[in-house]
């Protein structure tokens, strides 16, 4: 129910904003601000997914290609997501191991896909780590996001990139994020996939063309 998905974080933002205005306790204020920020991020992702999916359905999702530094995108995404990780989860990226390369692609859309995969991993990982990296394989770049979360059954893997499919119905989200990721990567002449076993985490990966 899309309206329910939107109302849930919106109600949290409104409710905790009202409480925040009434409390003088510093620790309570800090906790309420965190809750408001978390739900604001969720609401933004929900709205972005809905708008992008609408553009996909209309055939007007835009792309703008440019020479792009993947390492810069990875640095930015680490800064964005590191402080948002669950309490017992570490975000890991070995920047020294990342090759300094430029690929001709859409930096905005590639960033969107990486951000979505990291956010998804955080949603289903209660403890352990989420690592993301890329490496050059002949003819393309392979980008990976690997987590130590709950894992995904083979049944779900076969439909996970379909629209409105959710791994866990109790988790918030539109069920459109991975559909949008697949559409973007295929439009950029790449492929996307997942490898996982229940209880053993998941590895999401995608490729982008690279000519050296």
Model-derived features: positions:
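Short alpha-helical Gxxx[C/S/T] motif in the catalytic ATP-binding
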Residues: 177, 181
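Conserved C-terminal segment of the DHp
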Residues: 15-27, 31, 35, 83
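Helix-loop junction within the histidine kinase core
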Residues: 54-65
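Short conserved segment of the HATPase_c
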Residues: 15, 152-164
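Short helix-loop "hinge" at the ATP-lid/N-box region of the Bergerat-fold HATPase_c
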Residues: 121-122
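Short alpha-helical segment of the dimerization/phosphotransfer core of two-component systems
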Residues: 38-43
């Amino acid at each position: 129910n899309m309206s329910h998905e939107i109302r849930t974080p919106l109600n949290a933002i409104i409710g905790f904003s009202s409480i925040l205005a009434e409390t003088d306790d510093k620790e309570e204020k800090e906790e309420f601000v965190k809750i408001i920020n978390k739900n604001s991020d969720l609401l933004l992702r929900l709205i972005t997914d809905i708008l992008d999916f609408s553009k996909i359905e209309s055939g007007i999702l835009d792309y703008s290609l440019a020479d792009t530094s993947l390492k810069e995108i990875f640095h930015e995404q680490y800064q964005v997501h590191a402080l948002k990780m669950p309490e017992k989860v570490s975000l890991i990226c070995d920047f020294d191991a990342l090759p300094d390369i430029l690929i001709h692609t859409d930096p905005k859309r590639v960033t969107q896909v990486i951000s979505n995969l990291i956010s998804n991993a955080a949603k289903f990982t209660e403890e352990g780590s989420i690592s993301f990296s890329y490496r050059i394989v002949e003819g393309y770049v392979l980008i990976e996001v690997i987590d130590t979360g709950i894992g995904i059954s083979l049944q779900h893997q076969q439909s996970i990139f379909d629209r409105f499919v959710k791994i866990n119905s109790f988790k918030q989200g539109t069920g459109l994020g991975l559909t949008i990721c697949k559409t973007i990567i295929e439009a950029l002449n790449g492929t996307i996939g997942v490898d996982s076993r229940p209880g053993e985490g998941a590895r999401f990966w995608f490729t982008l063309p690279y000519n050296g």
